[in-house]
């Protein structure tokens, strides 16, 4: 038996041996560093393309895609094409964890890009940190994101959530007494981004003597805002500061209009930055005078902005909202980190490079503190004549503030 087996092993046809050898060579070549470095750079993300946060999530997808398209048209990243792998987390924290685990272990992406909102980026960034992968995210500025000692996390906006409305609150607090609101209301979505921002503004306004007459926190899946609108009507505040995303921001304005609630001043987070989509959702005639913090405007003279805006208009026949611009800027930051490190393998080198350098983006020049939080500030925008104008701080304003919210074409 042994002799026969030996003879059989020695008597394999030469053609089979040649085929086996050729197959092994191909496998080794495919697994070689040279082959991997010639292929596309795979960048993975999971976004809320469905569910409660789908509106900004789909805009973030557009922003990433426009960035990748322009990069590839200009020679790629380190001379290699960029390939996006995008999953849908359905606005769910458990799903986003599964998605990022799959991107790392199954899809074997070279780089990660963040998802949308602090709610989803909190668990997603923990997956990246555990795997020592750079995690640059476009929309997750809650202070909770940056008190965990992470080394690979970076936020691609100008400032943290709790700083987003500070310029507006300071402006209100410093108005002449006869022009300053006497009372304020603070409805807010239960969200790690919105609540710190509202709390910071409330602290400034209360210190200025503006009395709180109403406050409410509602669940992320709230659809009916009639009860809150009724509470606002009964309390009759001069100022409403609303911590919101897109869907609830739209729903709140509609409910306020139905209940005939019209504060002298209205500040909303999130929703007004969606541009034309916001205007169409609440009615263009109802936007006049609404304040909000701004990360991007289409006419900004910032790095790559003209190319981004033009390509977005060509592809989608619309003005790009800031959610798309924030994702595009995330791509710019990832690109700068890769070029700074000179490769896509050394994720620590990329993170170290970002801590030591600033990056020019469509949002302006961004730089970071040691914990990955940005160290800039947000300008404040106001809807005027159907368009967004930067109004605060005054030295950089495009237009003076117009007094009051004027819904219904007043």
Report the location of each language-model feature:
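Extracytosolic ligand-binding ectodomains
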Residues: 2-5, 21, 32-410
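Bacterial N-terminal signal peptides
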Residues: 18-30
